[in-house]
């Protein structure tokens, strides 16, 4: 919705500037009111310094708005990705192996594997008897 508003504002300013430069915009100035009072209607009066300055300002504003529109269209995601996964976020295959566990390090103790019996069928069983893994 914001893009549509910005584009429409850009279009309106462009049309206004085009009409302003062509002299079709109706502006009331002190010189034109004096011309109406005297009965002489001069439609295309010479542009005053004030009109030239405002036209220059409008052109500068239009160019700035055009630059802002082009910058908004070229926006790149600037958020820095975290090197660790946040709480509650799912791990994917790539980030799961790259997580370093620098917090608590456990002592590695080798226990002899105790196996009382070999399971006959591993498929379909919920747990293997006396095995850890």
UniProtKB/Swiss-Prot annotation:
Keywords associated with the record: Amidation, Cleavage on pair of basic residues, Developmental protein, Differentiation, Hormone, Secreted, Signal
Induction record: Expression is induced by neuronal activity in the developing cerebral cortex: expression is driven by the presence of a enhancer sequence only present in primates that binds the MEF2 transcription factors.
Principal subcellular localisation of the protein: secreted
GO terms under biological process: cell differentiation; cell surface receptor signaling pathway; endochondral bone growth; hormone-mediated signaling pathway; negative regulation of D-glucose import; negative regulation of dendrite extension; negative regulation of osteoblast differentiation
Function: Hormone that acts as a regulator of dendritic growth in the developing cerebral cortex in response to sensory experience. Induced in the brain following membrane depolarization and inhibits dendritic branching in neurons of the developing cortex. Probably acts by binding to natriuretic peptide receptor NPR3/NPR-C, thereby preventing binding between NPR3/NPR-C and natriuretic peptides, leading to increase cGMP production.
UniProt-listed PANTHER family: OSTEOCRIN (PTHR35353:SF1)
Family affiliation: Belongs to the Osteocrin family.
Protein name per Swiss-Prot or TrEMBL: Osteocrin
Protein encoded by which gene: OSTN
